[in-house]
A protein has these predicted regions:
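Tryptophan-centric aromatic hotspots in well-structured domains and transmembrane helices
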Residues: 43, 169, 256-259
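Short, hydrophobic/aromatic alpha-helical segments in well-folded domains
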Residues: 54, 199-200, 212-215
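Flexible glycine/proline-enriched surface loops and loop-helix/loop-strand junctions
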Residues: 35-36, 198, 209-210
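Conserved small-residue
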Residues: 97-100, 114-207, 247, 265-267
Length: 364
């Protein structure tokens, strides 16, 4: 099977005409107007062209079923920020226009198979896997300041990288005094001040999983049933918010690994503790350290989402109590999380306690 189509989307926060709101001026009296959106006479529909091809299959007398589909989505005239023209007089440094192009390519795979089919034993395993590669192919905008590139990456996308990008400084280690250092785009090391050029914020990964999926299994023996669901995702990054740095207000046991004496910079990336009263205090250190590339972590993770055991009460027992059928289920949700680092596990809520369930179902 294959398909090809074009979809459209209209802007909800932009219009061909100037929009403004009016309110009372409490200082000089009268009514005052404020422009909320500049006119956009060239506003057009966002258009997404989608082409896909897929195959559905069944094998081994329907014991193995599945499908695989490849897709290619190309978006044009996408709404994005563009740099404003100061002489227009509207007061906007950027405004929304049909100013972007983006591409998504990937595939989706679905499988379901009966591993065991017997009188007493039945075992079914199924799963789904999705892969998507996203890239901005055109946009005519640049962040006016580097902090906007960090704080609002989706408002200032870059060509050639994913839309949901994470940016940061390239880490240069600690200096001989235990202070954090980063590189700028020209390879210069900064320790006493933050790099200022937008190009100094380098692309470090996407915050959206490149691949994700689930594995479901159901094992049944006579009246007993065991079921589980495992979720996984990867290929993306997360910015660590659990940083061992006193100035960031986070308490972490990694602070015990901090720089204490000259030479420690060869063994640790945790800066020294410098109180604000010290002559060595640097107000830029927390910004350099928190936005450094060492704090953008691989976010690959596996989560056992559900685990349950169900007992189906025999029909002979149900009849004695005038019940058509009954079952008793004991289960757990959010059983455990596996991640590449304990910081990622913490940010994903992986240390939360599981939820326990007990369910009795009676059908009269």
């Amino acid at each position: 099977r294959c398909s090809y189509g074009i979809g459209g989307n209209i802007a909800k926060n932009s219009a061909p005409y100037m929009t403004a709101y009016y309110n009372n001026n409490t200082h000089v009296g009268g009514i005052q107007g404020t422009i909320s959106n500049r006119p956009n006479p060239d506003l057009r529909w966002e258009k997404t062209t989608t082409a896909n091809i897929g195959v559905d299959f069944s094998m081994f007398r329907n014991r193995l079923n599945g499908s695989i589909e490849y897709y290619n989505k190309s978006g044009v005239d996408l709404l994005a920020n563009t740099n404003g023209v100061p002489t227009e007089g509207f007061g906007f440094s950027t405004y929304t226009m049909n100013n972007g192009k983006m591409r998504n390519r990937g595939f989706e795979l679905t499988l379901s198979g009966d591993v065991i089919m017997g009188k007493d034993w039945n075992w079914n395993v199924g799963g789904v896997l999705g892969y998507n590669k996203n890239k901005v192919t055109y946009v005519n905008v640049k962040a006016p300041a580097i902090f906007l590139q960090f704080d609002y990456p989706a408002a200032y996308p870059r060509v050639g990288v994913p839309y949901n990008a994470i940016y940061g400084y390239l880490w240069a280690g600690l200096d001989s005094k235990g202070q954090p250092q980063v590189y700028d785009s020209e390879g210069n090391i900064h320790v006493s001040s933050s790099p200022q050029k937008v190009e100094d914020a380098v692309y470090l990964g996407t915050s959206v999983p490149v691949y994700s999926g689930a594995i479901n299994t159901n094992l049944r023996y006579k009246n007993w049933e065991l079921a589980a669901q495992l979720l996984f995702e990867g290929g993306h990054k997360m910015r660590n918010t659990n940083i061992a740095y006193p100035g960031l207000g986070v308490t972490s046991k990694d602070v015990s690994k901090r720089w204490c004496q000259p030479g420690d910079e060869a063994y640790t990336d945790v800066p020294r503790y410098v109180p604000s009263e010290s002559k060595d205090y640097n107000s830029y250190s927390s910004d350099l350290y928190s936005k450094a590339s060492i704090h953008v972590l691989d976010a690959d993770n596996w989560r056992l989402k559900n685990l349950s055991v169900t007992y189906h009460v025999p029909a002979s027992v149900c009849q004695k109590f005038y019940v058509k059928n009954a079952r008793i289920m004991l289960g757990m949700e959010n059983v455990f999380t596996l991640a590449k680092s304990r910081d990622v596990k913490w940010m994903l809520g992986g240390y939360s306690k599981p939820n326990y369930l007990c369910n009795v179902n009676l059908n009269f």
